[in-house]
From Swiss-Prot:
Domain of life: Eukaryota
Name by which UniProt lists this protein: Bradykinin-potentiating peptide NDBP12
GO CC annotations, alphabetized: extracellular region
Family: Belongs to the non-disulfide-bridged peptide (NDBP) superfamily. Long chain multifunctional peptide (group 2) family.
GO molecular function terms noted in the UniProt entry: peptidase inhibitor activity; toxin activity
GO biological process, one term: regulation of blood pressure
Main function: Inhibits angiotensin-converting enzyme (ACE), but does not serve as substrate for the enzyme. Potentiates bradykinin (BK) on the isolated guinea pig ileum as well as the isolated rat uterus for contraction. Also potentiates in vivo the depressor effect of BK on arterial blood pressure in the normotensive anesthetized rat.
Entry comment describing in which tissues the protein is expressed: Expressed by the venom gland.
Compartments it resides in: Secreted
Protein species of origin: Lychas mucronatus
The UniProt record lists the keyword Signal: yes
Biased composition (Low complexity): 64-75
Keyword field: Cleavage on pair of basic residues, Hypotensive agent, Metalloenzyme inhibitor, Metalloprotease inhibitor, Protease inhibitor, Secreted, Signal, Toxin
């Protein structure tokens, strides 16, 4: 997945949990959303979101990591001579 998509999912889950916890009329939905929040898949998404957020913050603060130097290119094959057409 794209890093931006993971960040969006991470922030949306945080906002949904915060809103649900702040309203009292969501009592039934609150229990359901707490179960979802504690589920394995939500935990994994939050972990990926935190990693993506940390990586993004490091990239912003330190600049992007330099790309490794390309390996020595394989020698190119000599050009193939074109055959003359007979008339």
């Amino acid at each position: 997945m794209n890093k931006r998509v993971l960040l969006v999912i991470f922030f949306v889950t945080l906002l949904v949990a915060d809103e649900v916890n702040s309203f009292s009329f969501f009592r039934k939905a609150k229990g359901f959303l707490k179960k979802i929040w504690k589920s394995k898949i939500a935990r994994r998404l939050r972990e990926k979101g935190m990693k993506a957020l940390k990586n993004y913050a490091n990239d912003v603060l330190n600049g992007p990591a330099e790309a490794p130097a390309p390996a020595a290119a394989a020698p190119e094959e000599p050009p193939v001579e074109q055959r003359r057409r007979r008339r």
